[in-house]
Every structure is written in C-alpha cells, then in structure tokens.
Amino acid sequence: MKKTLLGSLILLAFAGNVQADINTETSGKVTFFGKVVENTCKVKTEHKNLSVVLNDVGKNSLSTKVNTAMPTPFTITLQNCDPTTANGTANKANKVGLYFYSWKNVDKENNFTLKNEQTTADYATNVNIQLMESNGTKAISVVGKETEDFMHTNNNGVALNQTHPNNTHISGSTQLTTGTNELPLHFIAQYYATNKATAGKVQSSVDFQIAYE
C-alpha cells in the first residue's frame, strides 16, 4: 500500500513538472468575447428563403476584372423589432442589421464576392455575385472561412475585451425605434467579373443571420 501511494505521488509530481514546462514559444491562448442582447427581432417568414433573379447581361459588360453589371435590389424584412419589448437597458441593442456569410463559396481573392455555384456544362466563367449596401456604393464583404478581421492581436499582453466590438460585417445597419414592428432592410446584388467573362448560367447563394449593435 505504501509503495503504491509513493508511486502515485511521484507520478503526480512528475505530471505537474511536465505541465509547468510548456514552452511559451510554441504555445498560446485564444480568448473569445461576445454578448447576448435582449432584443427579439425575427426574420419575416416569407423572407427566410428568397430567390433574386438578375436580368440577363451581355458578356461584353463583364469583359474586364472588377466590372459590375445589372444592380438588382432585394429586401429582407424583420419583425418584432420594437425596442420597448426588450427587457432592461444594459443589454439592449440600438441598431440591427444582417450578417451575411458562406463557408463554401466566398471568394477572398475577389473582394469577398460569391462564387458561381453552377456546375452544368453551360455555366459562365469568371463571374461572381457581389452584394452591396442599399446606397449602391458600399460593397458588402461576405464573411467566409478566410475572413480575418475578427481577430485582434493582444498588445503587450493586454487582452482586448468587449469594449472593442466587431461590427464590421453588419450590413444594412438600421436604428431601432419605438413602435417598429416590421423593418425592411434593403440590399443590392450584381454581377462581378473576376476576369473576362464567358457566356453561361450564374447561380450563387449566401446565408444570413440577424446581428445587433
């Protein structure tokens, strides 16, 4: 019994020493921050799964990289956004928008536009879909698996915290006002040339979630 106990104590001591000897040059730490708010907006039922059809366009309109064509408006409507229905004030958001993301077809090399998902023999090449804010001038960078601006390096060992919110990817951000039941959020979709386009079909898709500020 004494030998067994002694062996266990030696083993524990050894394990403790191993744990204490982790090389700081080959290890690190990632800290995650977030916040849950009281707001209760919902996506209007008929807007949860939308189809947006862009008019046909001639390939000469997309003959050069970054050419765009056929800006097409679409709207996603939220409901139950009256801020007075949210409890308290400390954890209540003032603005709401949408967070667009896709883990499979975001094209980092072409301004985070959406790749053409068509795989039929007659699909267009060098053509993506770009999302824009409703003003038609600000591009939306769809979040993908290679998006990096959520990460922040800790400066001099001081961790960033929730006083550094990341709202870079909230699109259509709109002020919440009392009495708001339905809240339409407006956006634009357009063709985007990644090089000289060829004729054919174009299809892409993006996921979204409600996001608050």
Curated annotation (Swiss-Prot):
InterPro entries, alphabetized: Adhesion_dom_fimbrial, Adhesion_dom_fimbrial_sf, Adhesion_dom_sf, Bact_Fimbrial_Adh_Pro
Disulfide bonding pattern of the chain: 41-81
Any coiled-coil regions, as ranges: none
The entry's keywords: Disulfide bond, Fimbrium, Signal
Entry GO terms, CC: pilus
Taxonomic superkingdom: Bacteria
Gene3D superfamilies, per the entry: Fimbrial-type adhesion domain
Pfam families reported for this sequence: Fimbrial (PF00419)
Keyword Disulfide bond: yes
Signal peptide: 1-20
Subcellular location field: Fimbrium
GO biological process: cell adhesion involved in single-species biofilm formation
SUPFAM superfamilies membership: Bacterial adhesins (SSF49401)
PANTHER family noted in UniProt: FIMBRIAL SUBUNIT ELFA, FIMBRIAL SUBUNIT ELFA-RELATED
Main function: Mediates adherence to oropharyngeal epithelial cells. Helps the airway colonization process.
Family: Belongs to the fimbrial protein family.
Protein's name according to its UniProt entry: Major fimbrial subunit
Gene name of the encoded protein: hifA
